[in-house]
């Protein structure tokens, strides 16, 4: 058994896919017999400590968090001292075998600091926006100070996991990362949910229903979806936008300007079973992001049998197949996006064919296989750390056999 302290400033119900994925990985590791504690952000009404599905979750206070979906700069900065202080208290009273941080900033700063203070090996999982986001002024590619901080976190970690080859390449090429990086794609925990009819969900029966899901930020390019739909004159469609974030008001205004207000529903943040009920009631999933580190939401949509329309930029291109799982379009190519939407909307047979394919294809991305690779990599890192320290101390014999891990 390994004792793992996982740090992620965003953990459900906070954040987006990166938080959900870290929860699924942590839960799968506990199901394999390991002990996982989670250090994350406290927000309105959430308890400072609780047990969730076998995980002990510790939440630390931050300043300036505005909503569930999106962290402010000040909330991210304040997570570091709060996280280090809470982690210090935990590590003084309990022996952990390994630290695993998700996102280079701010979680990785916390993890690297605790690793140095206590001599415990640190594995950093890099996600996407922490490495590359061309739409944000405050991102490693657009801010030299942040680039320096992220580079230092990368090169101070004992091992890195990238959620896609795309993110690995960007860390090595753009940020000069010298630490070993293994690629471990996200997986999916097949959700259990009771399907509901469109009538129960308040969705018209006689329209082709498109759904976009994610934080409402520029990088998700939901603006392009609205622009594409404005070109589909006379087509009976409805767009459900699930999520919240700083772009919501601008998107609402754009929908009105384009004459789409009556055909676009802003659903707000939807979680758990309800999220999958809306996905299962839709016909097409569309999210042409400027960039995705991986895109867990695409797996969720495919599990519900939806054809997926995405962009050609990011880690999603490592598993989405143009013409097989749906369509891939260049970033910002509104006309091409409108064409692919129309093609799927007008061809029920094609939608059914892709739906059946996706429901089977997504089974390859099982979370248990992801957890097995994390387990093997963690065990290998712990062994290397103990050899370096000349310590084969208590608990070393309990580590899983093996320790090999591919990329």
Please give the residue ranges for each predicted region:
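Acidic anion/phosphate-binding donor-loop and adjacent secondary structure
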Residues: 172, 187-201, 206, 385
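Aromatic "clamp/platform" in nucleotide-sugar-dependent glycosyltransferases that forms part
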Residues: 290
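Nucleotide-sugar donor phosphate/pyrophosphate-binding loop at the beta->alpha transition
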Residues: 118-123, 131-152
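A short, well-ordered alpha-helix in the C-terminal region of glycosyltransferases
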Residues: 336, 343, 350-364, 373-376
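Conserved acidic donor-binding segment of nucleotide-sugar-dependent glycosyltransferases
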Residues: 322-323, 327-334, 343-348
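Carbohydrate-associated surface elements
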Residues: 42, 166, 187
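Conserved donor-binding/catalytic core segment of Leloir-type glycosyltransferases
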Residues: 161, 204-220, 226-229, 240
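Short hydrophobic beta-strand element within catalytic cores of glycosyltransferases
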Residues: 307-310
């Amino acid at each position: 058994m390994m004792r793992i302290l996982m740090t992620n400033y965003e953990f459900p119900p906070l954040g987006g896919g990166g938080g959900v994925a870290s929860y699924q990985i942590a839960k799968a590791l506990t199901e394999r017999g390991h002990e996982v504690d989670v250090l994350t952000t406290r927000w309105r009404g959430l308890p400072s400590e609780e047990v969730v599905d076998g995980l002990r979750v510790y939440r630390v206070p931050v300043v300036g968090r505005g909503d569930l979906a999106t962290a402010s700069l000040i909330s991210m900065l304040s997570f570091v001292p709060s996280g280090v202080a809470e982690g210090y208290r935990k590590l003084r009273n309990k022996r952990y075998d390994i630290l695993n941080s998700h996102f280079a900033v701010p979680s990785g700063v916390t993890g690297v600091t605790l690793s140095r203070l206590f001599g415990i090996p640190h594995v950093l999982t890099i996600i996407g926006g922490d490495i590359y986001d061309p739409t944000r002024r405050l991102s490693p590619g657009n801010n030299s100070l942040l680039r320096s901080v992220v580079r230092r976190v990368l090169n101070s970690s004992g091992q890195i996991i990238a959620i896609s080859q795309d993110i690995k390449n960007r860390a090595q090429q753009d940020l000069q990362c010298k630490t070993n990086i293994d690629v471990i794609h996200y997986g999916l925990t097949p959700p259990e949910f009771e399907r509901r009819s469109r009538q129960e969900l308040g969705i018209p029966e006689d329209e082709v229903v498109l759904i976009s899901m994610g934080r409402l930020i520029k990088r998700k390019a939901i603006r392009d979806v609205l622009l594409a739909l404005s070109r589909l004159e006379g087509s009976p469609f409805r767009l459900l936008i699930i999520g919240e974030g700083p772009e919501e008001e601008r998107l609402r205004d754009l929908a009105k300007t384009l004459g789409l207000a009556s055909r676009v529903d802003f659903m707000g943040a939807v979680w758990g079973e309800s999220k999958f009920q809306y996905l299962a009631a839709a016909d097409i999933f569309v999210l042409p992001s400027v960039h995705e580190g991986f895109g867990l939401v695409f797996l969720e949509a495919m599990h519900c049998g939806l054809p997926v329309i995405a962009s050609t930029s990011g880690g999603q291109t490592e598993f989405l197949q143009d013409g097989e799982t749906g369509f891939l379009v260049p970033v910002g190519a509104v006309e091409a996006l409108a064409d692919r939407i129309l093609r799927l909307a007008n061809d029920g047979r094609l939608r059914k064919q892709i739906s059946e394919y996706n429901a089977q294809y997504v089974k390859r991305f099982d979370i248990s296989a992801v957890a097995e690779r994390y387990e093997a990599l963690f065990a290998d890192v712990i062994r290397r750390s103990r050899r370096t320290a000349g310590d084969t101390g208590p608990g070393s014999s309990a580590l899983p056999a093996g320790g090999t891990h591919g990329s």
